[in-house]
Each structure stands twice: as structure tokens, then as C-alpha cells.
């Protein structure tokens, strides 16, 4: 099952929507998640996908906190589960391989232009509480996916702290399921996106977003768009199909200097992942 997430920065030009359709076709996407798609343009995108796929694609639920919309192949049994979260929503996907439902959480967290890192750190426990409450209702905290724009790098405090996303870079650690801190048990997420950091990492780029400032501290490449997995899904992640997409049908999404080609496109790059479920 192929998933793709892209923060499209409210770009709904005809040319760009055609590129999204081409990307869906080229990468054989089953579940397409688009962030910052204006509500008034959802139907346009849905109709374009239906036309391209001969009515084999449809929209799932509404906008997640007015930020993210999901489209999926008719072959995928996916439905909204809880859309009451702030900046996050939950969906259920039926897995024939696992013979159970998998939870898909889609997130678009607060950005750093309007929210400080300290403020993000204060808000992230609310996301964690929402996830754990939904998992409790589902009766399963081992088969969850979180995907989206976290507006944070994998190494930031909110992403790694026990009271936050508790997302680790090492699959063997994540497979332990939980760890105890000061007498309280915390459940792990596995974050495979760590593997893209640096020139020696996976793929062609070190992040999904590029920003150059005149500040003394600047990373330039930021890995804001990520996927996290609970331990029950680790063996089903196809590492070879985890990618930051940099081309669509031969057209480069990067400039000659290696930064993101934002004109007519988006300031984020899309991410693709595959779960053999």
C-alpha cells in the first residue's frame, strides 16, 4: 500500500494539479494526503483524480482541522475514525495482511513562523494525548501510523521526549514497545526519517523544506514532513520505497543549486512510503 503526503502551500494552479495527478500515477499511490489544500478547491482535485483513474479514486472525510485532505483508491478500505483533534485527525484502514484495522493519523502541526519551539513543546503533549485516547478506543496501540507536516525536525525535543512523540531513530529500540521513565511507561514510535539527514543519508536531499536565514544558527535543510510507526508495523515498512520525492516524470523539483524549485510548485517536497499491509 503506497502513501504520499505533500504540503502544497495552497497551490491549485492547473499545471500543479496536473503534476499531482502525474505523481500519483507514477508512484502508484493508493492513499494521497494533501496539506494546505484550500477547501474550495477540494472538489476540483477530487474530480481530476476521478477523471484520471476512471472513478477509482475518492475523497475520504473532510478537512483535518481545515488543513489536510485525504484521497484514496477505491481498492483501499479507509474511513474517518475521529476528526475532532486539533491539528490532527484519525482514520482506519483495513489490512487484509494483518486481518485488522490500522490507524492512520494525519497531522499538520503549528509552524515556527507563528509558534516558538518552546510553545511547540508545550502543545505536543496534547497531540500525544489525542493519539493515545484514539488508540485506546480502537483497542490497539501497536498498529498506528502518523504522517504529515510536524513543522519540526526529527531531533527536536518535542519529537523525541517521552512526553512528546517519543519517536526514536533505531528500529530495535522501537521494537521494545515501551520504556519507563520515573515510574511511568511511555510507548515508542519509530521514525525512519532520521535516515535522510546529511549528505550520506538516503535519497537526493537532506530534508523536505529549505530555508536560509541570516541567523547565527541555521540548519538550511529541515525535515519537517515525516512518518512515524508503532512497533507492530515496523516489519511491513518497505525501506526501499521510503523517499523524499525530487522528480515527477523526469521533471526535477530541485533547482540547479540543489534547493527546492518553489516557483509554480510548493516550498515543501512530497514524501512517499509503502507498507506491505
Explain the meaning of each model-derived region:
Residues 1-51, 55-60, 67-69, 262-277:
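N-terminal, active-site-proximal structural segment of metallo-dependent hydrolase catalytic domains
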Residues 6, 35, 107, 147-149:
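Active-site flanking residues adjacent to catalytic metal/cofactor-binding acidic residues
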Residues 9, 38, 110, 150-153:
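Catalytic metal-binding/acid-base residues of hydrolase active sites
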Residues 30, 142-144, 149, 225:
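Conserved acidic residues
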Residues 33-112:
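Structured beta-strand-rich core segments of catalytic domains in phosphoester-bond hydrolases
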Residues 109-124:
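Surface-exposed cleft-lining segments at the edges of enzyme active sites
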Residues 126-147:
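His/acidic metal-ligating clusters that form di-metal
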Residues 137-139, 152-277:
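Metal-dependent phosphoester-hydrolase catalytic domains
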